[in-house]
Amino acid sequence: MASKQLKLVIITGMSGAGKTVAMQSLEDLGYFCVDNLPPSLLPKFWELMKESDKMDKIALVMDLRGREFFDSIEPALDELDNTNFITTKILFLEADDKVLVSRYKETRRHHPLEPNGSVLDGINAERELLSDLKGRSQLVINTSNMAPRELRERINNEFQTEDKDIFNVQLMSFGFKYGIPIDADLVFDVRFLPNPHYIDKMRPLTGLDEDVYEYVMKWPETQTFLDKLVDLLMFTLPFYKREGKTQLVIAIGCTGGQHRSVALTEFVGKAIQQKYETTISHRDMKRRKGR
């Protein structure tokens, strides 16, 4: 592991400029994230991380909440710059004074440098203290005119690896009698389709069995619905991805989650797999006794 090049992103900048959103975005990109690590511990922390065979991307939030430790950040960064197995990138987030004041008023929080005084005084003091760090940052983003979604999109564009599609579609079948999946982003009800449950030889089977699958698929309403559903998903998925989502859960439900929803989930999953990383699961299929 020691010979492997490790990536470190240090997230810093003005309080209220979006560091939490940036950290969450990097976490979604597979980074191991630590908030408010004292800079003096940075070299020791990295020595521990390099021994792990599971962590090669680390993101650390460092700001003036730990002001008593912040003076040590420059020596710590100098030490990292001299370490040949670490690639360090500093992400500095800032915003205009007027925007930062407005954000503090909305949240009714005190500025960490002026807990009992003027928010603007705290902003000015923080901007001065961070000026040197901003000067050595590789990426500076002004979030004054950015919504959180837009910042997530910018972070994704800057840091996602080219060889990995970070957008995953999870297709899940389920039975309405057992409840709608609480983590579903989109839910489709296919109980309007003819039900194989009422055919004796198909009742103990599932939508994974050929007889059931062919029965569900033979109906014109099934084919029309699937054409429209796949077309809808292929149209909307790029926009969900653009919003900064890294995962979209699509749930397809029938009465018991055994026949119709299973067959349609398999079909839709195979269609989506042609363009997106896709996971297919059947939440309630094993509830049937004997399976």
Curated annotation (Swiss-Prot):
Binding site for ATP: G13, M14, S15, G16, A17, G18, K19, T20
The protein's name: Nucleotide-binding protein Lm4b_02443
Pfam family, one: RapZ-like_N
UniProt GO MF annotations: ATP binding; GTP binding
PANTHER family: RNASE ADAPTER PROTEIN RAPZ (PTHR30448:SF0)
Record function comment: Displays ATPase and GTPase activities.
Top-level lineage group: Bacteria
Family: Belongs to the RapZ-like family.
Binding sites annotated in the UniProt record for GTP: D63, L64, R65, G66
Organism: Listeria monocytogenes serotype 4b (strain CLIP80459)
Record keywords, A-Z: ATP-binding, GTP-binding, Nucleotide-binding
InterPro entries (UniProt xref): P-loop_NTPase (IPR027417), RapZ-like (IPR005337), RapZ-like_N (IPR053930), RapZ_C (IPR053931)
Organismal lineage: Bacteria, Bacillati, Bacillota, Bacilli, Bacillales
